[in-house]
Each structure stands twice: as C-alpha cells, then as structure tokens.
C-alpha cells in the first residue's frame, strides 16, 4: 500500500502547528492522568490477574480497546523536536485502521510471504520474522544471519545490528551511520546468498539509531528494496514521535515503500501498572497506523 501524500503532510503540518506541551509535563502529567482516568471510566483498575495472565474475556478486551481508543483521541502523539501534539479525531483514527491493508506481501520469487490479518483462532499461519536488531560484533554478523536463515521456519529477516563499521565505532547520527545502513544491507545479502534464501523479505534498517541508517541503506542501489522490504518506524513511548522517525517515514514515501510501526509501553513506566501499560499499547498501536500509515505494526 503506497503511502498517501495528503495524510503524510497532515502529520507533518500538525507536528508544527499542534498544541504545545513540554516532554516533562507529557510524561508526568498528561500520560499518567489520562490513562488513569480511562482505567476508572471503563472499570479496568486491578483487572490484571497474575494467575491468569492471558485473559480470554471478550468483554474485558472490548473495554480495554475502548479505553485505548479514548486515550489515543484525547492525547494524540507528541513530536519531541517541536514539542507540539499531533492530534487525530476519532474518525481519522478509524479511517487509519480501515485504510490499513488486510494483507500484504514481503519478499520476492519463492521467498514471497503473505502477511494477513488474523482473528482469534485463525487457521492462517503466522509469519516468523527473526531476530530483532540486537547488536553483534562485525565478524559475527554474516555467520549469525546465515545460521538463522538456514532455519526454514524463518519467513522474513530483520537481522542483528552493527556495533562497528569496518572496525570503527559506530556513532548515532554521524556519517558512520549513513554508511552502516548500506553495509548492513551488503552483509545481509551475503548471508542470504550463503543460506540459499535469495529474495527473502527484510525489515529495514536495524542499524538506524537515527534516520541516517535508513537514508543510507533503503531505496538506494544495492540497498534494501522498497518493492520487497518494509521500513521499521520505532517510536518512543508513550505516544511520541521525532524528526528522526518522520525522516524515515518521508524516505519511505519517496521510495514508494511500506512501513512497520512499533512502540513498546512497559509495565511500571509512565503508563503505570499492567492495566495502564495495556491501554497505552492499544492507544499507541492505533496512533501508529494513523500517523505512519503502517501496513504492519504493534505496541
């Protein structure tokens, strides 16, 4: 699904015209107070049962979803660089969900794989992506990726990330990172060749602590391919974005690609306990599909 320019510009414009909020106030007042109010409104306080961590109550799930939806509408997404809030209406968030594809593909040839929306007890098989951009030493990169890809259960590759580039320390936001984006693509392709998995889809770019890794490795000759791969847009919690993430979004638009939106609320953080973290995760996910036009994502 190609990214829509009007929706993209809407996000960028609101990042520069929305209500002002300092990050400290966002973290210590806006987020905890709004989530706590939603928990009370939907009677979700202390509903987490440690003895039953995977609660299968449809009614409880519905209340959590409505609470998360309310939080997404009320709070929006804070752009840290401008300290302005990108707000979305309830209708805009619903449209963002409706516009997300029911299915899409990554990879090419024999390695093409279908991602499809799966409901409860859905028999359609899940897609396995491995691993999660964990930093490894440079000499170990190719052997690790090759070993992973020799396991046929792996459908797509994110791969590890790099700590160094040709022996030099990799520094975020520096020219090293721009080079590292292409180097990671090169190393992945060599490991793919050795494992006999040519055409496998990839998540781009693991070695991108800022936007430069994506600019240096995605949509360029010999780099990650927009027609086959997906761009990682990992956004800060709770419900924040940055110029770095928006640069990646714009590069994806320029190259005609698709995005994965990710953001992980943690128990005990600004969202509070397990119930608050669950509500925050739902709100974040709704905003990721709305702001980033994600084809795939989670919080």
Describe the role of every protein-language-model region.
Residues 207, 217-299:
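Glycine-rich anion/phosphate-binding loop at the beta-strand->alpha-helix junction
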Residues 1-220, 234-244:
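Metallocofactor- and cofactor-centric catalytic cores in central/energy metabolism, strongly enriched
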